[in-house]
Amino acid sequence: MMERIRKEMILMERGLHSPTAGKRFSNLSNSAGNAVLEALENSQHPARLSPRLPSAPLHSALGELPAKGKFEIDTLFNLQHTGSESTVSSEISSAAESRKKPGHYSEAAAEADMSSDVEVGCSALRSPGGLGAAQLKENNGKGYAESGSAAGTTTSASGSGLGSLHGGSGGSGGSAALGGSGSGADQVRRYRTAFTREQIARLEKEFYRENYVSRPRRCELAAALNLPETTIKVWFQNRRMKDKRQRLAMSWPHPADPSFYTYMMTHAAATGSLPYPFHSHVPLHYYPHVGVTAAAAAAAASGAAAAASSPFATSIRPLDTFRALSHPYSRPELLCSFRHPGLYQAPAAAAGLNSAASAAAAAAAAAAAASSAAAAGAPPSGGSAPCSCLSCHSSQSAAAAAAAAAAALGSRGGGGGGGGGGGGGGGGAGAGGGSDFGCSAAAPRSESGFLPYSAAVLSKTAVSPPDQRDEAPLTR
């Protein structure tokens, strides 16, 4: 019974959808179709008659029609056996072989493929687009294998139709046609954005105002500069990384003392050497004690005489890191007044110092006296409490450790040792507790003696030749 229903369904589908079957059975009426069904049933089951149509009126009305119908059905379904099971298995095997072998097909093989499409049972596959794709494939000589394998879903069927229109074969061609636009978009080379001078100036100005811009501000800049918002976002990211690299590349004096680095950069920006104001992001009290020691002050004083003639002679060495203090620290009170304005008064000891060399020499003598007193265990000479600024940020352990280095450096300038001892007593009276430089906020200084560093020359320092180092007094 199931075989009969399947044959009826296949025959109805051929009458509705197959163009070849439509041509063959166009001259038959509904009764003729029923007669063909009856002939098919009688040929396979000769002992059983159809309950629907009697055999006598059928033969008297149609004459030779059953034999003709049986011939047509044999040619359609490739009937080679009388058993229905063998017929169905031969249909399935022929359909599978036709899927495996692409190439030119005969009419019978194409009809077998059509019957296999019917067995799939998806009504959406019989859309005009699917039939058009199949006809295009047959006309172009393409194989039906990929389209048959991709006919499980409507999407794959539409993909096969696109593939046949684009010259491909089957679902693979359709997927290539659909993915062609995406792959082409990915392969488009993205060139670098060429900013104009006005755009760069506006972006730099905005970066100096604020390193991180919000999205509404980025949108405003994009509208003002006629640039995409993502381009401005990427520019600010790159600019922040460039600024970070520049800060880290300045090996002096940032690793040793961030507070002094902040001081130098701020005053360089205030005088116009830097294009933007520098702001320290970490407070001074966050750092441990890495302040200027007595050895650094002695080294700074030794290079004070040659600072005017050759301010940036050679690159620094690890021991000569703070020799550059000689030039910008001709006014050491700027550091205290910069960090703690209004906390310090002018001592009388520093009132008569007017030049850069004499100021550095007196400061070095005071630092040497304070370090020697700290090394001997004596209390500091000053009476004021130490503050958290660079000049007052010192300890006895650092001073004791620096005394040996000061003695080693002082051996080069032994000729001026007597004068240094005399200056040490006067300079030590105005020094803070254990400090390298005195907190003199209002002492008169010459403006020409202070020259702040710029960002381009911060990696250089003053190193005096050996014959001029004995001009600055040093004490052991």
Swiss-Prot record:
It comes from Homo sapiens (Human). InterPro entries: Even-skipped_HD, HD, HD_metazoa, Homeobox_CS, Homeodomain-like_sf. Residues 188-247 bind DNA. Keywords: Developmental protein, DNA-binding, Homeobox, Nucleus. This is Homeobox even-skipped homolog protein 2. Transmembrane segments: none annotated. Residues 84-96, 147-159 have a biased composition (Low complexity). It is found in: Nucleus. The lineage of its organism: Eukaryota, Metazoa, Chordata, Craniata, Vertebrata.
